[in-house]
Amino acid sequence: VQHLKPLEHNESRVELSIGAVPLRIEGLSRSYGSLKVLSEINLEAQRNEIVSIVGPNGAGKTTLMRCISNGYEPTAGSVWLNGVKAGRGAPHSVVELGVGRSFQNTSLFSSLTVGECLRLARYRLERQPMFSYRTDLRLPEAALRILKATGLDKRLQEKVINLSHGLKRALELSVVLATEPTVLLLDEPTAGLTKTERILIGEILVDLSKKEGLCILLIEHDLDFVREVSSRIVVLHQGKLLLDGSVDEVVGSDLVRAIYSGEQLNETMEDVS
């Protein structure tokens, strides 16, 4: 790949259900034997929203992401994506319903070039040969915006292994966006990034939610970053959804302070319920 071009409007993936809620979770639970990791989670997320999921280690945040992106994960309950109920199926079937996911540790092939990673992302949609003689590649505007902002559009021939950690994170986000998701799941996208890189990623995510209409779910331990980018914050603790509110409501909550300080929560949780 030597040249990147924007997708024509009629080349883009047709939205699965016009006007449908991008993500709705009903009564979702996940158990491993007798250990209940998630309990009766109910949650909706809309277009143009960045919903941050916070909570201490072991709260069930990454498990929730897995349940959304893999139909085999939930023990009980249901996940609706763009108006379609996601049945029990492998992750690729969920991708076809409009979900894109970026992992805590980048999942790129280090031996491929930047351009090859992007072509691979488009393979399922375009059915073009992975290693074709075409030197151009058409990508959604959202993916192009990140590539241009980070200079990766000028480094298409460079192998992933030679990229900095920050550029690998940006490339993985571009690869996910190349699949044209309507629901974007991000697991600690700022982990290991410099302050400058965190600011850039934050600006890009806000831009994607507002201009591209994406529904973004974000797991993040950097609470300053969460404050800056979030439309809403959801608090998980011991597998339960304890709080779902605006940034100001959650940041100023006594419950959140208690969770992060390790205080006894029994009385506070009774008040919430």
Q: Over which residues does each language-model region extend?
A:
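Helix-to-loop junction immediately C-terminal to a conserved catalytic motif
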Residues: 69
